[in-house]
Amino acid sequence: MSKKLNDQELVRLDKLNRLIESKQNPYEVTKVANTHNTKSLKEKYDQFSKEQLAEMQLDKPITVSGRVILIRRTFILIQDFHSELQLYINKNKQPDLFKYFNDYLDLGDVVCATGKPMKTNTNELSLDLESLKIISKSLRVPPEKFHGIADEEIRSRKRYLDLVYNKESKERFVYRSKIIAAMRQYFNENGFLEVETPFLHAQIGGAAAKPFVTRYNALDRDYYLRIAPELPLKKLIVGSFEKIYEIGKCFRNEGMDSTHNPEFTSVETYVAYVDYIYMMELTEAIIKYIAKAIGISHTNIKNETIDWNKPFKRIKMTELVKQETGIDFTQVKKIDQALDLAKKHKVHVKEHEKTIGHIINLFFEEFCEKKLVEPTFVTHHPVEISPLSKLDYSDPRYTERFELFAFGKELANGFSELNDPIDQRQRFEKQLEEKQKGNDEASEMDEDFLEALENGLPPTGGLGIGVDRLVMMLTGTTSIRDILFFPHVREE
């Protein structure tokens, strides 16, 4: 061990050395012939009484393995992935085993236990030990309280300890896995094809965000970790695919807080020949399918509750702003009027945001977003903030776009995809103007994508769902750290 050891760690290291000297090196064990895990053992034998177990004759002893999380006199509590099991050493019948237990065993050790099922006087199913072998020695002292680690920083940095000693944490990650599996199952059952697109992009695109930059030595140029897979996926729709999805990592070189991590998981899906209304229906169907699949109907966060079975609400962004502020931005025709309203309501407007559309969005973010607790589709975003969305041709100030909000946070984003290459080029040019005015998140001109559009993108609906946010909302978790196995943390 590289660092200076404390007294307890020195004792543990001494025990390991004595095990090795006595030809009982735990690290020489390469496999274990377990007959049961803790769950299957309980399912099979917990139904029997103490007397029935005492009389029961087994064809062979039971073997189960797990980590020691509690030692109390002649009892040991072990834990595997499924649950916990008590082990019992009869020191009168097994003096050598009791000596081994006293000489070598510590909290945190991984052991292989063999014996016969029994029940204690308190009717707890236990394993009456015939043999016990340490198969991995814990040289570090585990947290003092086996029932949990309270320090959030330790839990994030040392997730392996958190998973061992916090049952709720492990359950959240099991839910995460089930949520992604259910999501994939929904798509596959409904005729979608799972695809993969590059993580390294030659140009920034697909979302408004700052990228991570890396050097591609073989090509002698900078590349970007993708901020979204949108543009490559739409190229596949041009290439005759009609129902596709991708679940994967995206990267945004921005701040960290309770709902943002620079590396995150999203799902994006694209369907040919449909519009944003179809994609809203699809979004709602996916989320309800997942909630049902994992057995969650309601979620409570900070005394606010969502019933996932209820229909999701829909409202235009301008209508919502009018409800909350009394301002009808559909009647605002001049930028000076919009700027005066922003000044009056103390809404800060940056140089690149001096358009009516940007100001509508700023009002929405300031006065509306946090109040959207129940799942709500906010629709018809201004064209200025939607460079990849098809226009609402009945009022081209707005687009056929929606965002889904719940618990005051964005959960999904979708729209009728802009498939007019001439309009798309003009939108990219507007983005370049914004970049010159200080918008670091503005898109670049993507000639390769424009060429794809010029070959003909059919009417298409697109959708992106933040998987991490979805896991948080379905499990009632307030910090994104708690649903990422290894969240990014600042150096100690």
UniProtKB/Swiss-Prot annotation:
One Gene Ontology biological process: lysyl-tRNA aminoacylation
Localization, UniProt: Cytoplasm
Catalytic activity annotation: tRNA(Lys) + L-lysine + ATP = L-lysyl-tRNA(Lys) + AMP + diphosphate
Residue numbers binding Mg(2+) 2: E410
The protein, known as: Lysine--tRNA ligase
Membership in a protein family: Belongs to the class-II aminoacyl-tRNA synthetase family.
Protein residues bound to Mg(2+) 1: E403, E410
Assigned EC number: 6.1.1.6
GO molecular function, one term: tRNA binding
Membrane-crossing residue ranges in chain numbering: none
Assembly and oligomerization: Homodimer.
UniProt cofactor note: Binds 3 Mg(2+) ions per subunit.
Keywords attached to this entry: Aminoacyl-tRNA synthetase, ATP-binding, Cytoplasm, Ligase, Magnesium, Metal-binding, Nucleotide-binding, Protein biosynthesis
Organism whose genome encodes this protein: Mycoplasmoides gallisepticum (strain R(low / passage 15 / clone 2))
GO cellular component term, pick one: cytosol
PANTHER family found in the cross-reference section: LYSINE--TRNA LIGASE, CHLOROPLASTIC_MITOCHONDRIAL, LYSYL-TRNA SYNTHETASE
Uppermost EC category: ligase
UniProt-listed PROSITE patterns: AA_TRNA_LIGASE_II
Pfam families assigned to the protein according to its UniProt record, in alphabetical order: tRNA-synt_2 (PF00152), tRNA_anti-codon (PF01336)
CDD domains (alphabetical): LysRS_core, LysRS_N
